[in-house]
Amino acid sequence: MGSPVQLSLLCVVLASLLLPGKGVFINRERANNVLARTRRANSFFEEFKKGNLERECMEEICSYEEVREIFEDDEKTKEYWTKYKDGDQCESSPCQNQGACRDGIGGYTCTCSEGFEGKNCELFVRKLCRLDNGDCDQFCREEQNSVVCSCASGYFLGNDGKSCISTAPFPCGKITTGRRKRSVALNTSDSELDLEDALLDEDFLSPTENPIELLNLNETQPERSSDDLVRIVGGRECKDGECPWQALLINEDNEGFCGGTILNEFYILTAAHCLHQARRFKVRVGDRNTEKEEGNEMVHEVDVVIKHNKFQRDTYDYDIAVLRLKTPITFRMNVAPACLPQKDWAESTLMTQKTGIVSGFGRTHEKGRQSNILKMLEVPYVDRNTCKLSTSFSITQNMFCAGYEAKLEDACQGDSGGPHVTRFKNTYYVTGIVSWGEGCARKGKYGIYTKVTTFLKWIDRSMKARVGPTAETPRTAGPPN
């Protein structure tokens, strides 16, 4: 309650306003002056007091700068200011399906939970392949606005229509453990192929003949320097069972000169240019140390050499070949195939991953000696335009680039023909063949790889062209009609 003195003064003021000749009402300005509220702190000491939200913005009208001085944090200032100026737009909880609401001046923004979209997260997003691979374990494709899952060779689709299951002890694309059971052969497709059709797209050679004499169709064309043959610089040793699809091509002196990828128990994928580097060669699998026997190594003779007949020795275009072995590989520790993917799925899903993995026994640096230890290296995919600008050589549609611009890690001489695989949900798929590069781990230069997705049909036809380990002596195919 006010004191008697204060009440008396108020009565005097009000009485003076009602002097004779004056109206009952007064203008707003005079009334506000009479009822004006005195500030709690005087103007001088106000500047020295720490900002107080109640004093500055509730008892008085505050400015944005005053709010910022109170919170001393830009984000908290903006959050409070938007509510202070026009109220909390999120108060009515406009975001549906557990969406998070963020208030704004004159509006709000919803951050939707996975599977929902729209201004208020009111729209359900169909789980197509672009969203978490449609929940498929392996291959995903879209049909009539729905997802269809499928599996790599050697797997079958589970009852849920999503998972891929294999009963084989060593299915493709899985790192191996200590299991030593024999696996079944993997089929790449259920469809049949006419042998003559297959022969139109590749060259067939017998390794008992001289590959140099049979393959020198482009002998007069200029070749890249041997220093440009890709080729692991950097990286680390492949742990036990970690690179089971690695194959090694060995010459008559039992020396490794190129790599390869195990596709199934009879077939090895490699680079076409490797076929020019030895008169006769065999394939060794299960090797992690060429100077030490570990019990999993096996050597296989080659029955048929299938080289793409469009291979260009001057550009390394179509640098791909398939080797058929005389005897089947027994899958075991450190010996298992990598999976062949589906083309569209591989290009939209696998090759949009950040990295792939290369492995081999190549040189440990550009002028160094061959490694006796199997090494692996994770390499990032490189944007196509970036790669093309990094070299004066042609980067065709049958190639892709991977590696580091400046980091001293790369594939190198001796790794040629070896695997480039990409991991997806703990399964490894063949995505490339080590092909060529300018030196090893040079700054601004990348490794160039044969793009396997371009040749998946060719690989499938090549593996179907012979049906048993005792195929008759192959012949060299003519050019495509």
Swiss-Prot record:
GO terms for cellular component: extracellular region. Residues 21-40, 184-231 form a propeptide. The keyword Disulfide bond applies. Keywords: Blood coagulation, Calcium, Cleavage on pair of basic residues, Disulfide bond, EGF-like domain, Gamma-carboxyglutamic acid, Glycoprotein, Hemostasis, Hydrolase, Hydroxylation, Protease, Repeat, Secreted, Serine protease, Signal, Zymogen. The active site is at H273, D319, S416. Residues 232-464 form the Peptidase S1 domain. GO terms for biological process: blood coagulation; proteolysis. InterPro entries: Coagulation_fac-like_Gla_dom, EGF-like_Ca-bd_dom, EGF-like_dom, EGF-type_Asp/Asn_hydroxyl_site, EGF_Ca-bd_CS, GLA-like_dom_SF, GLA_domain, Pept_S1A_FX. It holds the Pfam family EGF. It comes from the Eukaryota. Its EC number is 3.4.21.6. Its main location: secreted. It catalyses: Selective cleavage of Arg-|-Thr and then Arg-|-Ile bonds in prothrombin to form thrombin. It is found in: Secreted. The modification (3R)-3-hydroxyaspartate is found at D103. Residues 1-20 form the signal peptide. Plasma; synthesized in the liver. The modification 4-carboxyglutamate is found at E46, E47, E54, E56, E59, E60, E65, E66, E69, E72, E75, E79. Glycans are attached at N187, N218. It is an enzyme of class 3 (hydrolase). Belongs to the peptidase S1 family. Factor Xa is a vitamin K-dependent glycoprotein that converts prothrombin to thrombin in the presence of factor Va, calcium and phospholipid during blood clotting. Factor Xa activates pro-inflammatory and pro-fibrotic signaling pathways in a protease-activated receptor (PAR)-dependent manner. The two chains are formed from a single-chain precursor by the excision of two Arg residues and are held together by 1 or more disulfide bonds. Forms a heterodimer with SERPINA5. Interacts (activated) with guianensin, an anticoagulant protein from Simulium guianense saliva. Interacts (activated) with simukunin, an anticoagulant protein from Simulium vittatum saliva. This is Coagulation factor X. The lineage of its organism: Eukaryota, Metazoa, Chordata, Craniata, Vertebrata.
